[in-house]
Regions:
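Conserved phosphotransfer microenvironments
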Residues: 39-59, 65-88
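Conserved acidic segment of CheY-like receiver
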Residues: 2-13, 17-21, 31-32, 39-42, ...
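Alpha4-beta5-alpha5 switch/output surface of CheY-like receiver
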Residues: 80, 106-109
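Short, flexible helix-to-coil linker/hinge segments that flank and couple to helix-turn-helix
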Residues: 109-115, 120-159
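Conserved phosphotransfer cores of two-component systems
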Residues: 63-65, 88-94, 116
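A short, hydrophobic beta-strand element within the central beta-sheet of small alpha/beta folds
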Residues: 94-105
């Protein structure tokens, strides 16, 4: 059973994706991961703590939920700050992050996110079939990127 969580800033889009993945055999969707704004959250209330950063809070919540695959909206990484992604990769290594992007996402931003631990990227408006394929592929240890993006990654590696 592959556990999946979706951290998308658009609740309607997130709900549609959750519903489409829930109907798939072998996938358990962890819902209500992100109920308010741009914060990743679980439906369980944490004890209030002082001096905790938003990133630490997210890491604690994801660590408690333990999704195998976490779809994260690229918009969460404002101004190229990938501290959340780096912390997820370091402290929750069992959780594999796939970025949700749109046409406005810059290739360099995606490559930076991949370099900081993301295991793939997918247009957030893609057909649900592609989300299912991404879950299966990333769960098996592979990456999920377009061939065009793979070419750009190879150019970076070789030059």
């Amino acid at each position: 059973m592959v556990t999946v969580a979706i951290a998308d800033t658009d609740p309607g889009r997130r709900t549609r994706l959750e519903q489409s993945l829930q109907s798939e055999e072998g996938i358990k969707v962890l819902t209500n991961v992100m109920p308010n704004g741009n914060k990743i959250s679980s439906n369980r209330r944490s004890k209030p703590r002082t001096n905790i950063t938003a990133i630490e809070d997210v890491i604690t919540r994801i660590g408690r939920l333990k999704p195998r695959i976490l779809f994260v909206d690229l918009d969460q990484f404002i101004n190229g700050d990938f501290a959340l992604l780096e912390a997820l990769h370091r402290k929750c290594p069992e959780t594999l992050v796939v970025l949700l992007t749109d046409k406005s996402a810059k290739d360099e931003q995606i490559i930076q996110a991949l370099a900081n631990g993301a295991r793939g990227c997918l247009n957030r408006e893609a057909a649900s079939l592609y989300f299912l394929k991404a879950v299966r592929v990333v769960d098996q240890g592979e990456i999920w990127v377009t061939r065009k993006m793979l070419g750009k990654i190879m150019d970076k590696v070789l030059h």
